[in-house]
Amino acid sequence: MSDWTHKIAVLGAGSWGTALAALLARHGHPTVLWGRDAAMVDTIDRTHENARYLPGIALPDSLRATTDLQAAVADATWILVVVPSHAFTETIRLIAPLRPAGAGVAWATKGFEPGSGRFLHEVARDILGPSVPLAVVTGPSFAKEVTLGLPTAITVHGDDAAFAQVVADAMHGPTFRAYTGDDMVGAELGGAMKNVLAVATGVADGMQLGLNARAGLITRGLNEMLRLAAVIGARPETLMGLAGLGDLVLTCTGDLSRNRRLGLALGRGQSLDDAIREIGQVVESVQTADEVMRQAEHHGIELPISNAVRAVLHGEITPEAGLKELLARERKPEYPQTLFT
């Protein structure tokens, strides 16, 4: 927890945006939460509860909420964007002319830009220009547990070490550890791919394939992360840390994960539409699976688990057929000799 306070604008009043805004407010930072839904935002501001996404959990009295974006970012020391990946580009464009001079921009969004497959730091840099400090907040963290004050560890990676440290210091506290790094590519890759792989483990558990299968999918899923990391310039140690392995294990095993719950529903025979409707929130893996495989095809590498998830989500194969294909693959060395070189 830092010894000085910042005014922080948190953009996105879903479960994760609300949790991070509450965390920052509890640490003594004047924090404003911005959202589009006027009724929900008004309720948060008046009752200090996000009844839609975090029902029954009291938010700090000091936390303010508004639908006025200009008012939210005015005089902000830095801005934290926490919107779904499909809304990220638009949100960055909206804040570009409103951002106070010198204010850095961080985000806790996980995924790629839909359509282009670009990393989110590439999108932000393209829109905001070369001089704005940027950082990505990622790691194994369920919003509900953070809001309840349960122990959590995350990591902040940025292209400006001083700004990454500012963000980490503001978040760090008695039950919330915030580390720092400078591998934005690796941090964003881990945060995106774990959502796809969580669907795979959810499907396996929904089909009651056992704990051995789950462990195998997590481990081989990590291998796929490392394989893609090796060809796009990410560092393997980033994927072996909180941004990769940590987030992967949590999302693949914790039933608070929307992506795991999607897989569970598909493994039990539900349709994709019914499963998404039942979850009732954005499920990033549906779009991210396409972008992951676009990256893999561009670089000429195989990601069999991710590809099977993509095919199941598109209705091209059944979960049973996907499992059969994975088990029938030719055996190879567990790790290529070039993976860590």
Swiss-Prot record:
Subcellular location: Cytoplasm
InterPro entries, per database record: 6-PGluconate_DH-like_C_sf, 6PGD_dom2, G3P_DH_NAD-dep, G3P_DH_NAD-dep_C, G3P_DH_NAD-dep_N, NAD(P)-bd_dom_sf
Pathway: Membrane lipid metabolism; glycerophospholipid metabolism
GO cellular component terms, A-Z: cytosol
EC annotation from Swiss-Prot or TrEMBL: 1.1.1.94
One record GO biological process: carbohydrate metabolic process
Active-site positions on this chain: 194
Molecular function GO terms recorded: glycerol-3-phosphate dehydrogenase [NAD(P)+] activity; NAD binding
Enzyme class, broadest EC rank: oxidoreductase
Catalyzed chemical reaction(s): sn-glycerol 3-phosphate + NAD(+) = dihydroxyacetone phosphate + NADH + H(+); sn-glycerol 3-phosphate + NADP(+) = dihydroxyacetone phosphate + NADPH + H(+)
Keyword Cell inner membrane: no
Binding-site residues, sn-glycerol 3-phosphate: 110, 139, 141, 194, 247, 257-259
Annotated binding of NADPH, by residue: 15-16, 36, 110, 143, 258, 282, 284
Keyword annotations of the record: Cytoplasm, Lipid biosynthesis, Lipid metabolism, NAD, NADP, Nucleotide-binding, Oxidoreductase, Phospholipid biosynthesis, Phospholipid metabolism
Function field: Catalyzes the reduction of the glycolytic intermediate dihydroxyacetone phosphate (DHAP) to sn-glycerol 3-phosphate (G3P), the key precursor for phospholipid synthesis.
Family to which the UniProt record says this protein belongs: Belongs to the NAD-dependent glycerol-3-phosphate dehydrogenase family.
Listed name of the protein: Glycerol-3-phosphate dehydrogenase [NAD(P)+]
Lineage of the organism: Bacteria, Pseudomonadati, Pseudomonadota, Gammaproteobacteria, Lysobacterales
